[in-house]
Amino acid sequence: MGSLKEIKVRIASIRSTQKITAAMKMVSSAKFHHAQTQTEHTLTYANKLSAILNGLLSAECDLDSPYTEQRKVSKVAIAVFASSTGLCGTFNANIWKELSATIQTYKNQQIEVRLYPIGKKIADELHKAGYSFDTDFITIGEKPSYESAVSLANRLMELFVTGKA
């Protein structure tokens, strides 16, 4: 057993570590809450956009667009969003689990999958698992902008129109 002084130093060290851990937990919690709030605002927008698109598609007029034509699904593109840091609890792990299951489902149906990871953690997981993926958009989630979203959307729309996804 150590001396009384060694024990006091060890206790002080543990308390210091606990304070640092608590501060890190508060910071990550605040960041997560901020991201969750932004996601909720986006969900409202997405629901309205979906309603508008459903209204357009159910209208009786002919909509001549390459995005509305029916075709056999042989290729898909998946843009998967995750964090670039690890202070998110199980967030990245849950996304990886869902992505793996989705990829496997498509592979079982002999459907080719193209991957577009947004976030360093999900890109690292894809790399470890041996998947090939587009690296152009990995960091756009760190500082989201309209321009980067348009760039990703244009790439995905181009792939769809050309039949590559």
Which stretches of residues belong to each language-model region?
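Conserved loop-to-helix interface motifs that mediate assembly, gating, or partner/ligand docking
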Residues: 2-165
